[in-house]
Amino acid sequence: MRANVGKLLKGIDRYNPENLTTLEHYVEIQAKENAYDLEANLAVLKLYQFNPACFQTTVTAQILLKALTNLPHTDFTLCKCMIDQARQEEEPICQILYLGELLETCHFQAFWQALDKNMDLLDGITGFEDSVRKFICHVVGITYQHIDHWLLAKMMGDLSDNQLKTWMSKYGWTETEPGTIFICNQEESVKPKNIVEKIDFDSESLPAPAVFPDILLEYPV
């Protein structure tokens, strides 16, 4: 179906309201099959802007949740900016925006607590939680050298020891001592770049005042 949708998004047909039903169905397929197509989803939101009467809260919620699965990319912000302010204050959209804010500001424990109270939001969304955990692992990987075992488990959504070990194995993290997980040596990860700029400047070819004019003004020869 992705190929067919790609054809619909070309040229003036991109914002043809007659294609909206097909595009909305495509959003549902993405949710169920753990697929993702930002271009198609943005087209749906743009069609809602052009045709406010066609707005579907459920489809918009699915688009926002799918955008969260692609953090740290800016997809969520792009989608949010295309939703009318009045619609952003409606449920469940306002709840999803709050979840997005918690993730973007790295309040991971608060995110899982808020999500636990709104698990119905994930109905029909396959792989959402694991996609969020990938983002959390990305943040941990660029932030920590060592992290407490209990803290990582909390940040990942209160995972069991076996579940946490699976993620640790995936990212090459090891428990070097009881209760402490080694992430990486951040100093070794930093790769400084030396930038050398060579400027050819033939001072002898210029008149004396043009070489150091400020000095010559203070100390005339």
State where each predicted segment sits.
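Charged, E/D/K/R/S-rich low-complexity terminal regions of large eukaryotic assembly subunits
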Residues: 1-36, 50-62, 66-221
